[in-house]
């Protein structure tokens, strides 16, 4: 009895020590990943605040010693006197992104709800086409998209950046999976009470689908805000360029050395909206990713 009594506390201490060591290694790994992921963002913030004499100092500095907002001032004032002001690029990105997100949410939710709850003729083949579309990269469909947009005479317009991204297969599939969890008993009860279909969709289905369409909105915002390839293909006018193309314009050409601080500020302004949107909506995104279905 004495031997067993002495052995159990010792084994318990070894277990606690082993558990503490494994947890320490886990935290160490997570901290390393945070540093690796956060270091580029930290360098970007410092570079946007660095005066010109610190940007080209040798050896290079990661941490800014004399922070200044001069780079942002030059970006929004000095460059605004050029042919296309930088604020125009911000407006182009904001307008095309917001319009795309709003239309995409409505179209994908309506399409998925109608396909799942009303089951029209050919709903099976339609869903099969959506699944097949998930297998292709967006770059594969750029040439067909360009041919369609060119046929509609929408090249070099805002609609060229909006229409091809309205009905994305992944967004449709995401909402469709949530629509399958909508309890039919609630919808039937509303119909028995005399509710019209548009009322059922907007007042009952959409609130229940909020985790799905908020996640759709976040993904759509981030993808469209950071999209470089589509504006490069569809847009040739400087007045219609978005922020990713504006960064390319600022980073090259004559006087690029003098604009280095402004380029850092432009990079900061381009990156921050995506981070803020995801940080604000991360709760809904995590809820959707965990697929917390609606119980009847």
Task: Give residue spans per PLM region.
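A hydrophobic, multi-pass inner-membrane permease signature
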Residues: 2-296
């Amino acid at each position: 009895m004495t031997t067993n009594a002495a052995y159990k506390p010792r084994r318990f201490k070894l277990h606690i020590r082993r558990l503490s060591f494994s947890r320490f290694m886990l935290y160490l790994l997570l901290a390393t990943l945070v540093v690796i992921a956060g270091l580029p963002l930290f360098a970007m913030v410092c570079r946007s605040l660095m005066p010109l004499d610190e940007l080209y100092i040798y050896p290079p500095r990661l941490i800014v010693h004399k922070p200044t907002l001069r780079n942002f001032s030059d970006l929004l004032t000095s460059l605004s006197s050029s042919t296309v002001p930088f604020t125009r690029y911000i407006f182009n990105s904001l307008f095309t992104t917001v319009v795309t997100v709003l239309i995409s949410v409505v179209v994908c939710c309506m399409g998925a709800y109608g396909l799942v709850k009303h089951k029209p003729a050919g709903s099976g083949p339609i869903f099969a086409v959506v699944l097949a579309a998930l297998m292709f990269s967006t770059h594969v469909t750029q040439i067909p998209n360009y041919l369609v947009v060119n046929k509609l005479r929408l090249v070099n317009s805002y609609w060229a950046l909006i229409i091809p991204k309205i009905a994305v297969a992944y967004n449709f599939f995401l909402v469709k999976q949530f629509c399958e969890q909508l309890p039919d008993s609630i919808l039937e009860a509303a119909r028995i009470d005399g509710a019209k279909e548009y009322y059922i969709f907007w007042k009952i289905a959409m609130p229940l689908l909020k985790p799905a369409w908020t996640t759709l909105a976040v993904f759509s915002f981030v993808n469209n805000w950071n999209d470089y390839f589509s504006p490069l293909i569809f847009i040739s006018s400087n007045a219609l360029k978005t922020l990713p193309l504006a960064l390319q314009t600022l980073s090259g050409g004559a006087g690029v050395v003098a604009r280095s601080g402004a380029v850092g500020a432009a990079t900061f302004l381009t990156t921050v909206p995506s981070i803020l949107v995801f940080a604000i909506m991360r709760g809904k995104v995590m809820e959707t990713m965990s697929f917390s279905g609606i119980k009847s």
